C-alpha cells in the first residue's frame, strides 16, 4: 500500500530526528518539534500503521519508534530521485593544479570527503595496466584433480585446485599445457575471452568435459589479477557515533576495513549512478548494521574506480549523497583533464 502524504511527513520526521539524536522518537515529540499539523494521538496512530507496514520499528515496548531499513530505503529513494537530473546545491573549491600519481589524486579526494562528511570513506583504485598471463601450467595431483598454475608478466604466481568430474589420463597434460599457453599467454583479455567462448570446447574434443572447470578457473584468475587496491580514510570517525561506543562493535568495524577482499566486492559498481545499500540490503553479514553510499568516478566517461561512504544506518543520507555526488564529479573532471591523452 503506498504511503499517503501524512504518513510520509511523519516518517520523514522520525528519520530526521533519529539521525540527529540516535534516540527513539515518540508522537508527542513529533507534534511539538515538527509542524505537521496533527495531534499527538493522530500521529501515534499513524506511527503504529507505519510500524505495521514495516517502515518503523519499536526497540522497546515503552520506547518511541526508530526507522527500519525499509523506512530508510523509502527516504533514500526520494532523495535520489532529486539527484538524477539535478546538480546538488553545494560546491567545493577543490580543483587545483596537481601533478601527482593517479592513486595519490584519488586518495586526496577520499581524504577530503572523509573530512567534510565526518564519515569513513573508502576508494577502489583502478588498475590501468592489468597484469597479463605469462605462463600456465597444469600439474596432475590425482586422476581427477589438477593444480592450475598461473604466472604473470610481473611475477605474480597464483594456483588453483581443480576437481574434475571424470578421470583424466596424465598423458594429455602436455597437450593441455601447450594449448593454453599458445592461446592465452601474453594475450589480451579480449582475445582470451574469445578463445574461451568460441574455440576451447571444440579444440578439447573428447576432453570437453573439463572445459567448464578450465574456463571458470581462467576467468577467476583474470578477475583476481585485475582486483584493485582499497584505500580507507577517516576510519576513526565511526567512534563518534553512539552506536559504536561499544568496543566489540567498533572492533568488528575495524576488522571489516581490514578485509580488502570484502570491501572490493562492496565497492563493485552495480549502477552507473549513486548507489545506496542500507543495513540488511547488504549481502555480507558484516555489513548488516551499516549503510554504504557509493558512486563511480570516470575518465572521459569511462568508469575507472569507485568511492564510497560507510557508516551506521542512522546517517544523514541527504547531506552525504549531495557531498559524494559533488566530490566524484570534481574528481572525474580533474582526472579527465590530466589523463586525457594517456588513457
From Swiss-Prot:
Cross-referenced InterPro entries: GAF-like_dom_sf, HrcA, HrcA_C, WH-like_DNA-bd_sf, WH_DNA-bd_sf, WHTH_transcript_rep_HrcA_IDD
One biological process term in Gene Ontology: negative regulation of DNA-templated transcription
Task performed by this protein: Negative regulator of class I heat shock genes (grpE-dnaK-dnaJ and groELS operons). Prevents heat-shock induction of these operons.
Biological source species: Thermoanaerobacter pseudethanolicus (strain ATCC 33223 / 39E) (Clostridium thermohydrosulfuricum)
Keyword annotations from UniProtKB, A to Z: Repressor, Stress response, Transcription, Transcription regulation
Transcription among keywords: yes
Protein name from the UniProt record: Heat-inducible transcription repressor HrcA
Any Pfam family the entry gives: HrcA
